[in-house]
Amino acid sequence: MSIYQFNFKNIDGEEVSFKSLEGKVVLIVNTASHCGLTYHYKGLERLYQDYKDDGFEIIGFPCNQFGKQEPGTADEIKSFCDLNYGISFQLSEKIEVNGTNAHPVYQYLKSELKGKLNDSIKWNFTKFLVDSNGVPFKRFSSTVEPEDIKPFIDELIGNK
């Protein structure tokens, strides 16, 4: 099993297959525009710029499940990310990451890489690093800075 069997809708409402990312290392992150950790967007964009030419992708999944910190429409989210952080990596439409309506890729990621207490996502900016075969490799809590993920990206890109 891998992420390649799943699809998502991008922020513009277009269907995207994870299969289109085959052979790339992917970081999947649930995001929010009005969170104390929103500054992670800056570090995520830096990671993307540093590694995009090496077969690395980031997909941000806006989510309003934690403190209702992503209340905006798709256009508002896109505008916020562009104006404040110059985000050039992919964003999805707003999704849920926990509960019965959790996006299928999040159901899969959580079943493969559990958190400290259980499989649920605890907060915004939880990160999942997926290897170039589409297999979940490592889960990072919200408090892990994007910069601190670099050694793991290097390891996976080196293993390609």
What annotation goes with each model-predicted range?
Residues 1-160:
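Chalcogenol-based redox active-site neighborhoods
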